[in-house]
Regions:
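Extended hydrophobic leader/signal-anchor segments used for secretion and membrane insertion
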Residues: 1-133
Length: 133
């Protein structure tokens, strides 16, 4: 009788653990504390990103590491493209991205960083949807 009671709980617990592992492996769930991506992503929104995202393109919104922080920005230029900023022209290295916040007046992004490029290795996901505001 005890064996039967244990097996009743074993399957749901195992399925829950497998489901949580798969969700954690595929999806990123995050919180956006700043207004740097407004109006696209409101300050205080929860977002869902995909860890496996395929080829990234100009216009994609990505989650990446920069100076020890996870940030969310839009790709403005990909490797091989040039970016004009003021009187300067920057060539984005292959395998890197130039990123901007949608709220240009309230975004610390590639325009202000010492190294303005985000290497592909620092990207952890691509935004698939905004969950809640």
């Amino acid at each position: 009788m005890k064996q039967k009671k244990r097996s009743i709980w074993l399957v749901p617990v195992a399925m829950t653990m497998i489901t949580l592992f798969l969700l954690k492996s595929i999806f990123l769930i995050g919180y956006v504390p700043t207004a740097s991506m407004e109006p696209t992503i409101k300050q205080g929104s929860f977002i869902v990103g995909l860890r496996f995202y395929g080829e990234l393109e100009r216009g994609d919104i990505i989650i990446f590491w920069h100076d020890g922080k996870l940030l969310v920005k839009r790709i403005a230029a990909v490797g091989g493209e040039s970016v004009r900023w003021g009187e300067s022209i920057l060539c984005v290295p292959e395998g890197s991205f130039y990123v901007l916040g949608d709220n240009a007046d309230n975004s610390k992004d590639s325009r202000y960083w010492e190294d303005p490029f985000v290497p592909e290795e620092q990207i952890v996901g691509k935004i698939s949807l905004q969950a809640l505001t």
